[in-house]
UniProtKB/Swiss-Prot annotation:
UniProt xrefs under NCBIfam families: rpsS_bact
Protein's GO biological process: ribosomal small subunit assembly; translation
Keyword DNA-binding in annotation: no
GO molecular function: rRNA binding; structural constituent of ribosome
Keywords: Ribonucleoprotein, Ribosomal protein, RNA-binding, rRNA-binding
Family in the record: Belongs to the universal ribosomal protein uS19 family.
Protein name (database record): Small ribosomal subunit protein uS19
Summary of the function given for this chain in its UniProt record: Protein S19 forms a complex with S13 that binds strongly to the 16S ribosomal RNA.
Keyword rRNA-binding: yes
A GO-annotated cellular component: cytoplasm
Source taxon at top rank: Bacteria
Gene3D superfamilies in UniProt: 30s Ribosomal Protein S19, Chain A
């Protein structure tokens, strides 16, 4: 179920403040965040966020196509190594 339209997109307050400060200063530094649940807004385009995936901060450069999605969608939390190979195939 999606979020109600009348509520608007969710963004943590501190993240919005950090993004505004970064825009004003004009420096290209990574904004570290643990807020995977925050929605990407149009004013975030061009900024780089360090989104925490449980182990480290993954750098996510925001583009126009990402607007409306959540930050956590671009920092996977699980690593897929593939299914185990058949033991008989390994021997040959």
């Amino acid at each position: 179920m999606s979020r109600s339209v009348w509520k608007g997109p969710f963004v943590d307050g501190y993240l919005l403040k950090k993004a505004d400060k970064s825009r004003e200063s004009g420096r290209k530094e990574v904004i570290k965040t643990w807020s995977r649940r925050s929605t990407i807004l149009p004013q975030f385009v061009g900024l780089t966020f360090g989104v925490y995936n449980g182990q480290k901060h993954i750098p996510v450069s925001v583009s126009e196509e990402m607007v409306g999605h959540k930050l956590g969608e671009f920092a996977p939390t699980r690593t897929y190594y593939g299914h185990g190979a058949d033991k008989k195939a390994k021997r040959k």
